[in-house]
């Protein structure tokens, strides 16, 4: 349920991403407008708000903003990330100057320096990977193959919090409370094994997909040739054939998003009986799961098919596959030929980005991602004031109260269901800025001269941390995002929310800004995350995160009718010629957008204490609220990236999320929207999920 990010630029960090005229206008407007927050220079007033509210709010910005050559898209995440990068670079510069020899600062310095030093990486060649490649080459039977596959498993998927279903390893592992075992933490087994983003990239007859497949096959061959692999062309063909079979075994994304589908618990014996082909003892022992007796078979239909492929496909094909993915996953810390080939395919073919980012920026982000708590603690100590934490906590409380009022006012919901919903709202655990406790990095080996080993060690260390939770009580206060990430998340089995520090700044939140701006921007984000607790997935969990039915049949039928109407609404949006948004695939995010926006608006009105909002720069309070929301979704994407989002992501493209205002009655009144305008919906067709 990862929240896609907002986009409201009101700071000088926009200079790096916008052309000079847009930047100068925004800076001047910020100076003149004080702390209003709305960028009127972004607006295209030639567009009627009732025809296209995204273009009305953001049209001039879209026309005048160029996507940087080293980016696949530009938007709120990237603008805010410029500040996050600036702050993190300052932190790292100070740490490295101190030349630390121990503690987390030494880990940060060593990881960063090793990643940055491409001369050393190039000089080392494939020596750091030799042991891994030799082990694959030595495989001669299915037991050894199963062990090798098990040794690659990592905690690199997350179906519940991040809706991340993709891993190059044959299976993904995720550890939390089991969907069918409240109070008991289990390892989830998930489908994996493909290098392209999603199964449709292999199976679609679309000519663009066929072209991508051809380029992927050529990329595989390039990587293997760079490694001196024998018969790289033949191996690439075998890998492509194997991955196509793996993709055919995969469950589609809509099925992956259905939590009820992922609630099957298999014992160790059932796993072996239901999914023959793999030597499960060898695989689980190598994966550190040899003592696990229960598994959440999240992709229960795919697991037997993937296991069968291990039993039926030639060992050589699997050795080819293991070799390629070992190199592909670590290409960024291998010699230049690997780095360049990886960017040419993953960066340019898949995302449309023409230019790679500077190595120091890549090193900074890689270090921040690898040592999340070490960097995060230093980050919040310096850049996140206690006053911001307190103000956001107050906004969260106001949003929760608004959501509760909206639940109480629903006419179609029975008292028993309302009682459960209110109990769930009241029980939400909210984390603002950073976690209550930090990871202990004792035992993690990070050196200053082996970036490949560092990357491997961090992934293994994180995996061992996750599987150590098996059988232990769930911590409802556990964080699933680092503080230095510009994002927010709802955690369904914890009934909890995380709002990292990096999103709680301009352009998302300004402690001195007009209430209309803050509630339209970060307030809608807070409302979105609260509302995820009541989307088609979140509504399956109760106040303590147990998956159980707390709805009456009639109530859920009414709820589903509203959800279906919203799915149909989004099905109509065309992202690229012939490529429409999938309303079912994006439904939970769309529900959270609509319900969260409604709750944020109600909380904003309550914050006025019965007083009228002032008119500022010719804009009423309601107009500023809705413009802040729409400007939070300002975005410009390369076509390749937009296609990938539509096909693989649970979020609709931002330009369509901005149009969610059409379901809010107050928006019609604020902008005089009339029948006949393109976004107009008759009152009985406006989706009213949760109020």
Residue ranges and their predicted role:
Residues 1-4:
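Positively charged n-region of N-terminal signal peptides that target proteins for export
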Residues 31-34, 45-123:
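Active-site-surrounding "flap" and adjacent substrate/cofactor-binding loops of secreted or lumenal enzymes
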Residues 61-65, 196-197, 507:
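Short, solvent-exposed loop/turn elements at domain surfaces
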Residues 95-398:
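Noncatalytic, helix-rich "gating/capping" subdomain that lines the substrate-entry/channel surface
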């Amino acid at each position: 349920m990862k929240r896609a990010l907002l986009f409201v630029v009101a700071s000088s960090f926009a200079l790096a991403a916008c052309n000079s005229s847009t930047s100068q206008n925004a800076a001047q407007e910020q100076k003149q407008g004080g702390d209003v927050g709305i960028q009127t220079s972004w607006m295209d007033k030639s567009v009627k708000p009732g025809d296209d509210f995204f273009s009305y709010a953001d049209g001039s910005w879209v026309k005048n903003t160029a996507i940087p050559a080293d980016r696949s898209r530009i938007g709120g995440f990237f603008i805010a990330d410029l500040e996050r990068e600036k702050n993190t670079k300052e932190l790292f510069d100070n740490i490295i100057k101190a030349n630390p020899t121990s503690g987390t600062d030494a880990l940060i310095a060593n990881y960063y320096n090793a990643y940055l030093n491409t001369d050393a990486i190039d000089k080392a060649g494939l020596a750091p990977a030799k042991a891994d490649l030799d082990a694959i080459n030595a495989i001669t039977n299915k037991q050894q193959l199963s062990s090798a596959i098990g040794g690659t498993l990592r905690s690199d998927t997350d179906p519940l919090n991040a809706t991340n279903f993709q891993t190059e390893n044959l299976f993904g592992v995720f550890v939390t409370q089991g969907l069918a075992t409240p109070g008991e933490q289990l390892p989830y087994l998930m489908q994996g094994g493909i290098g392209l983003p999603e199964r449709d990239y292999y199976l679609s007859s679309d000519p663009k997909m066929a072209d991508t497949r051809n380029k992927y096959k050529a990329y595989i061959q390039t990587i293997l040739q760079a490694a001196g692999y024998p018969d790289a062309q033949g191996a690439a063909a075998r890998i492509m054939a194997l991955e196509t079979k793996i993709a055919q075994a995969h469950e589609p994304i809509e099925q992956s998003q259905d939590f009820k589908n992922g609630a099957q618990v298999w014992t160790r014996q059932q796993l072996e009986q239901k999914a023959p082909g793999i030597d499960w003892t060898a695989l689980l022992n190598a994966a550190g799961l040899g003592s696990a007796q229960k598994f959440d078979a999240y992709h229960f239909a795919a697991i037997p098919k993937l296991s069968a492929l291990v039993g039926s496909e030639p060992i050589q094909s699997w050795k080819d596959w293991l070799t390629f993915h070992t190199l592909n996953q670590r290409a960024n810390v291998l010699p230049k030929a690997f780095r360049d080939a990886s960017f040419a395919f993953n960066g340019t073919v898949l995302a449309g980005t023409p230019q790679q980012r500077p190595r120091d920026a890549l090193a900074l982000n890689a270090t921040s991602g690898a040592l999340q708590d070490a960097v995060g603690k230093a980050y919040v100590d310096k850049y996140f004031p206690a006053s911001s934490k307190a103000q956001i906590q107050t906004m969260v409380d106001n949003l929760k109260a608004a959501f509760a009022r909206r639940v109480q006012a629903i006419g179609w919901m029975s008292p028993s269901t309302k009682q459960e919903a209110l109990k769930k709202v009241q029980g939400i655990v909210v984390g603002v800025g950073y976690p209550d406790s930090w990871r202990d990095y004792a035992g993690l080996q990070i050196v200053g001269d082996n970036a490949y080993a560092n990357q491997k060690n961090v992934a293994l260390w994180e995996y061992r941390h996750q599987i150590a939770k098996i059988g232990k009580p769930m911590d409802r206060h556990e964080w699933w995002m680092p503080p230095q990430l510009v994002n927010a998340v709802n955690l369904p089995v914890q009934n909890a929310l995380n709002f990292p520090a990096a999103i709680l700044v301009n352009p998302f939140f300004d402690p001195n800004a007009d209430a209309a701006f803050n509630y339209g921007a970060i307030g809608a984000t807070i409302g979105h995350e609260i509302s995820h607790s009541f989307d088609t997935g979140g509504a399956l969990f109760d106040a303590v995160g147990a998956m159980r039915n707390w709805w009456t049949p009639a109530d859920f039928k009414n709820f589903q009718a509203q959800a279906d109407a919203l799915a149909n609404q989004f099905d109509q949006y065309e992202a690229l010629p012939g490529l429409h948004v999938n309303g079912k695939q994006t439904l939970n995010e769309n529900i959270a957008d609509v319900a969260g926006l409604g709750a944020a608006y109600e909380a904003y009105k309550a914050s006025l204490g019965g007083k009228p909002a002032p008119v500022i720069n010719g804009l009423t309070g309601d107009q500023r609220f809705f413009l802040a929301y729409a400007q939070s979704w300002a975005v410009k994407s390369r076509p390749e990236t937009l296609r990938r989002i539509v096909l693989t992501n649970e979020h609709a493209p931002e330009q369509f999320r901005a149009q969610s205002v059409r379901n809010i009655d107050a928006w019609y009144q604020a902008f005089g929207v009339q029948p006949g305008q393109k976004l107009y919906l008759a009152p009985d067709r406006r989706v009213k999920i949760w109020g």
